[in-house]
Swiss-Prot record:
Transmembrane segments: none annotated. Pfam families: Toxin_2 (PF00451). Expressed by the venom gland. Disulfide bonds join C29-C50, C35-C55, C39-C57. One of its GO terms (cellular component) is extracellular region. GO terms for molecular function: ion channel inhibitor activity; potassium channel regulator activity; sodium channel regulator activity; toxin activity. This is Potassium channel toxin alpha-KTx 4.2. It is found in: Secreted. Blocker for small-conductance calcium-activated potassium channels KCa2.2/KCNN2 (Kd=80 nM) and KCa2.3/KCNN3 (Kd=197 nM) and ERG1/Kv11.1/KCNH2 potassium channels (53% inhibition at 5 uM). Has also been shown to inhibit Kv1.1/KCNA1 and Nav1.7/SCN9A with a moderate potency, as well as Kv11.1/KCNH2/ERG1 and Kv1.2/KCNA2 with a low potency. It comes from Tityus serrulatus (Brazilian scorpion). Keywords: Calcium-activated potassium channel impairing toxin, Disulfide bond, Ion channel impairing toxin, Neurotoxin, Potassium channel impairing toxin, Secreted, Signal, Toxin, Voltage-gated potassium channel impairing toxin, Voltage-gated sodium channel impairing toxin. Residues 21-22 form a propeptide.
Amino acid sequence: MKVLYGILIIFILCSMFYLSQEVVIGQRCYRSPDCYSACKKLVGKATGKCTNGRCDC
């Protein structure tokens, strides 16, 4: 049972590391499509979202 908890903790830590690879840029936005061109230049992918008036790539 302890092995299961150990594997679960490792999985959660790895997931948190992978999910925190977003890049917050200083461009102001009002909706997500405003971020697509800036994220394409910065990261290479046109995926981004507008969070609290800032672009997250």
